[in-house]
Amino acid sequence: MASETHNVKKRNFCNKIEDHFIDLPRKKISNFTNKNMKEVKKSPKQLAAYINRTVGQTVKSPDKLRKVIYRRKKVHHPFPNPCYRKKQSPGSGGCDMANKENELACAGHLPEKLHHDSRTYLVNSSDSGSSQTESPSSKYSGFFSEVSQDHETMAQVLFSRNMRLNVALTFWRKRSISELVAYLLRIEDLGVVVDCLPVLTNCLQEEKQYISLGCCVDLLPLVKSLLKSKFEEYVIVGLNWLQAVIKRWWSELSSKTEIINDGNIQILKQQLSGLWEQENHLTLVPGYTGNIAKDVDAYLLQLH
């Protein structure tokens, strides 16, 4: 009897414990979990049928699946520039965010040297292009047009001077000194003569062979006009040329022999003497001009 009573108490205690656990609040199970638990409780035959049906739906039309995969590979071409991406459709939000992060990361890790070199190349290319295509006349065309609005006469003089100097420069580059002298005599422009004569003077001082005695004789009328000018710069250019001619041909000019092979020496001596009789007053001019005139006068006095 005692044992039966003990067993009854034990059974009642266990029932209370079970009731207690049953009454405890349980964690809410989702519908998906309940559905899976129900499917697990299915019979083996039902489970096998379910598996076959599910697999059949997945494997259904494998050609279509391969076609989709092929199209996806065809769209995503590898680009040379990893930071350039074709804009994707709005439906792929996650992929867009990932691609945008990759683009920002790639842009952040680009070498600074490459960026500097490209910028330098652009700057250099732009500088070289402007230097090759733009001439000085086209570069300052706006400035010239603005200045010439109220100075049309001066603009014409400068244009004419520039054109004549270009012609003289063409003769000089060809080393056609006789043609250059003939051109200077024909235009009778003392401004162009003043620009060209110092070059010929340097050639005489360096004893260049392409400056002949005949060219020097032909230039004497222009030099006489320079010595009569009211501009001291013109006078200095003429005196420097006279000094160079006398020193270059001094051995022939100072020769006492009556037989002279070149007749231009006699012509040059006579013209120099007649020219200096009219312009010997230049020795009274103070400064650099008077010093050159005194040196020329000292040479010409020995010829009398």
Curated annotation (Swiss-Prot):
One annotated Gene Ontology cellular component of this protein: nucleus
Localisation: Nucleus; Cytoplasm, Cytoskeleton, Spindle pole
Keyword Phosphoprotein attributed: yes
Known outcome of mutating R71A: Redistributes from the nucleus to both nucleus and cytoplasm. Complete redistribution from the nucleus to the cytoplasm
Transmembrane region(s): none
Motif (Nuclear localization signal 2): 72-79
Sequence positions bearing Phosphoserine: S61
Function: Regulates microtubule-severing activity of KATNAL1 in a concentration-dependent manner in vitro.
Subunit structure: Interacts with KATNA1 and KATNAL1; these interactions are competed by KATNB1 which has a higher affinity for them.
Name under which the protein is recorded: KATNB1-like protein 1
The species this protein was found in: Homo sapiens
The organism's taxonomic lineage, starting at the top: Eukaryota, Metazoa, Chordata, Craniata, Vertebrata
Gene: KATNBL1
